[in-house]
């Protein structure tokens, strides 16, 4: 893919997700269960959401902890949506929107007590993301990272073929635990995002959005790939999905 084509593709993908509450699968109740089981953070806690999209998790974290959240995303469109949503919820004083590259943060070592990232680590590769982010997390600090993961060792060929092309570094949960350990984290727990919330909170709103879009050559390609992804998940959601890895910096 040429640079121009890549730029057009990213623009079309951004436009497809414009206005959606979530830019990927997730669920507030599911996240709250994880948060309720985390160890107590310092009184002056430092929280970051990397790859925040339009802020579904950042806003939840701000509400839950009543603490500032540094929310980072490379899309200015999504950052603008986050600012609007924060204002609507009366949380603008707690949200620190940062338009930037989550792989090139110039933050001090140990400057984050809770690092949260949903559906974004794959952009760097799970292990690479953890190695880049580990220095940011304080000693014994917590990271909660969701990562596309295989759930079983016996895998259907169509799913393998699709993901070898879409995300060749995708591993199973055991492999990802090993990767986390190699990156300076202890794995405290893992939690699989239920397949039904993929549909309820992400795929169904995405389908409605597709019906509203004006079709262009670049959007046509993105829509075709998105529909292929949805069909695959409909058939094989027992075999893969997002696992949330709750990690402690060691």
Label every model-predicted segment:
Residues 114-127:
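A short SAM/SAH-binding and catalytic strip from SAM-dependent methyltransferases
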Residues 48, 54-104:
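Class I SAM-dependent methyltransferase SAM/SAH-binding core
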Residues 105-114:
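A short acidic, Gly/Pro-enriched loop at the edge of an enzyme's catalytic core
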Residues 128-142:
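A short glycine-rich, Lys/Arg-flanked "PGG" loop and its adjoining helix->strand segment in the class I
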